Amino acid sequence: NPASSLETPVLDKLASGGMVFDGAYHMGSFSGAVCSPSRRMIMSGRTLWHLKPTGKKRRKKGKKVAEPSGPNPHRYTLPAVFNKAGYATMRTCKNGNSYEGANALFTVRRDATKRGGTDSSGSAWHADQVLDYLSQRQKQKKKAPFLIYFGFSHPHDTRDGRPELLKKYGAVNHTDRSKLPPANASQPALPPNYLPKHPFDHGHTSVRDEVGVKGVWNKRDEYTIRNELGREFACSENIDIQIGRVLEKLEAMGELENTYIVYTADHGMAIGRHGLQGKQNMYEHTWRVPFIVKGPGIKPGSRAVGNIFLLDVLATVCDLAGIKAPATSEGLSFRPVLEGKKEVVRDVLYGAYCGGGRPGTRCVKKGDWKLTKYDVTKTGVRHTQLFNLKENPHEFIKAHQSPEVTPLTGVKPGPGQVNLAGDPKYAAKLKEMEALLLEEMRRHDDPYRLWNQPDDGLVVPVIKAKPDRKKPKKPRKPKKKP
């Protein structure tokens, strides 16, 4: 993004040497920890509602119907498939909120959560693990092909960056909740779609990401958001540096031009956009993911829409490696896009979030048009958004035109850059997108239906509240008198 003040020379070079996808997405989440189903989809190639290998039954008009079951992680996931094909597999990433059954199958596994501002406590640690692994391969003269899953703990909060990078982006590791962080001209500007508050309950207002991130908490003022963006930028540039170290090692080994490199993320993040902070929403800034692929046969400096999901990664890397993808994978290989033979692999994209109030948020995108619906039963919120993303890529809503907001962002949306759901001129388009959303929900075995949809005979899933596991403190015994 040339408009961003974030400096990522390594990723810029990777992009200029490969292909950038402008339409890459995660499918969604049924929990506040969006990274968990996102990573499980990468590992398994399964769609969102087919992830849980429960084998349970649900009722449909009085009849028992088998729930879609997920794959056995010991047989059909990314490391298992490549292990079987003779690859040496290695991973390093954060601990937790992932796919443990698959993670355990990597031949070499070095996971730890590293969100500090030093080499030993931050992103450099993850790079060190990959560099050590490659050095050992080189020393032992191993010839087997390799698959490396190279992940980081940052830029997930807490975003305690390296001091020199925090200084570069005018940020501080703010810890005093009673005060605002200091203003600094070096901080990133507010995003164009910044809001001081989301205008309605989006379904998960109490999740940790929205109220408990250290340095932000429930604040959405300019000082807090710009400082947190600076912290995110500091962490992101450090990741760029660490990726560069590994790419330099591959080049020194003579392997760089013989290796497919896929760069992506679990999800996006709001940090002030639309008045939100976390990842529990389906706006473009959070639903979309960055995606770059470089490797043999890919035209340098190319760009495509793609319309890909993270769950397509397994099918694609298998295709590139000449390995048969497991039958349990539901992903589509986007190799034809990489080779310039196609612009997209699917015409319609479906997304869901119901980690908070259910049914939650659903969205569907086709071409330039996107429909998002919010159905939060516990608060009675029922809201519909219709956007033409070509005309309104930032998904501006009426609140963005407020005289309290435009001076802060320096952006005044045009008259057509609003939610079009209530405009009679777009009634036909709204009806078309509503029908498309229902079709996608049925196709993906979404267990919920929204307020204006037929229930299809589905019994609303019952989500049991987690019991309070804290044991009551026992009263202290009085001390015996001497």
Label the model's feature ranges.
Residues 17-22, 84-90, 141-148, 256-261, ...:
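Loop/turn elements at helix/coil->beta-strand transitions in domains of secreted/extracellular proteins
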Residues 37-140, 146, 158-166, 341, ...:
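Catalytic-site neighborhoods of secreted/periplasmic enzymes
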Residues 2-39, 45-46, 50, 88-90, ...:
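Short, structured active-site-proximal loop/turn typified by the sulfatase FGly-forming signature C/S-X-P-X-R
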Residues 1-5, 29, 113-121, 134-311, ...:
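Active-site-proximal cap/lid insertion segments
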Residues 1-3, 20-43, 54, 91-102, ...:
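Short, solvent-exposed turn/loop segments enriched in Gly/Ser/Thr/Pro and often Arg
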